[in-house]
Amino acid sequence: MTSRPRTAARLAAAVLALATGASCAPSPRTCLTLVPEPPADKDTVQVVFLGVGGLIVRWQGAAVMAAPLYSNPTIGEIALSEIHPDRQRIDALLRQDIAGVGAIFSGHAHYDHLMDVPYVALHKAEHADLVGNNAMVKLLEPIRRRLEPRQELVSLESPNPPVYEVPGAQIRIRSVASLHSPQMGPHLVGWLGRLLINFPRVTLWRGEDEDPAKELPVRAGNWTAGTTQAFVIELLDAGGDVAFRIYYQDSPTVAPYGYPDWPNNPNRYELAILCLGGATEYKTFPGDIVRYLAPAYVMGIHWENFFDPRPLPTPGATGVKQRIDYAPGVKEGKFLGRVRDAQPAGGRAIVPCPDQVATFRKDASGWRLVDDKGWSKRR
């Protein structure tokens, strides 16, 4: 049995590593948040970044959602107390209409992806199936009876089929076996930290329990990741052909993990949604995955310091300016530079603010941004 002093020492080391990484982080970014989402045209693809790993994809009057996080427990709360969905903060910050969302998907089952999902699914997206891996299904077992019969828990991990057709929507989701990057390591702590300690790569909360949970977890470490997945999201036309293809990941990866159809990509990708947080130990990311997918557009997500809860806004406030810290180790400029070096000619990239919307419309030359504010210039 681990002694309390030893546990405290390990926790202190982890917090020190994160703090050291944070101390080297760029200055906070000023974002315009709580921007009302414009109505979605049926013939456009609308992608709304919700913050952390969350987003909404709208197509032909239907929508799917990547698991959002608004509760954002602090490091102190994670270490010293139970953690629970902050319903007040979710209600205040999740302004988008998600009543028509057909599925909420998550690539792994850590708390920063799944903790808020039960409340969102049961009270806001009441027709959405919950799609993920086997660990997600086990951890959310305690709410199964409340979800059924309108909603289901769906695993796309083996031995289950890896493809999910969203009911009543021209949207298909395909899982790709991936892995979770180390949250901490020598490149996060920097050269000074490496002089003081031989810091190993640390991947927190790996694996999964054998049996379904009897209660929803209330400790961060009990939200175990399971087998991490990436997703290919295919938006289909009336004939069932792919009109717009999206790659989504909620953890950085290295080849061949998370690379669809490895080693030869046969498909065109209009948009790749890539995770910035946790990428410090992967020197070839994101260049390798961008070269492999050759997407016309790249969106970087999970860049914020999610240990810092967003402030509660004044009721009804819109267009609120907010200073948001980067997650430890995240360097937006370096990420965008590597993306640009790897993208095909004409490619564009962005690291969006929470509530920012990207709308794509097709013309004779292909899919184009309706409003390109904040996007990089064409490569």
Locations of the language-model features?
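Metal-dependent catalytic neighborhoods of phosphoester/phosphodiester hydrolases
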Residues: 115-125, 142-143, 311
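Active-site neighborhood of phospho(di)ester-bond hydrolases with catalytic His/Asp-centered motifs
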Residues: 66-67, 100-110, 131-133, 246-252, ...
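Binuclear metal-ion centers of metallo-dependent hydrolases, dominated by the metallo-beta-lactamase
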Residues: 129, 137, 141-172, 291-379
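C-terminal motif of bacterial Sec signal peptides marking the signal peptidase cleavage site
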Residues: 22-23
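Active-site-proximal loop/helix segments of hydrolase catalytic cores
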Residues: 210-293
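Pre-active-site segment of Zn-dependent metallo-hydrolases
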Residues: 32-40, 59-110, 115-122, 182-196, ...
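Bacterial N-terminal signal peptides that target proteins for export
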Residues: 2-12
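Metallo-beta-lactamase
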Residues: 28-42, 134-230, 234-241, 343-344, ...
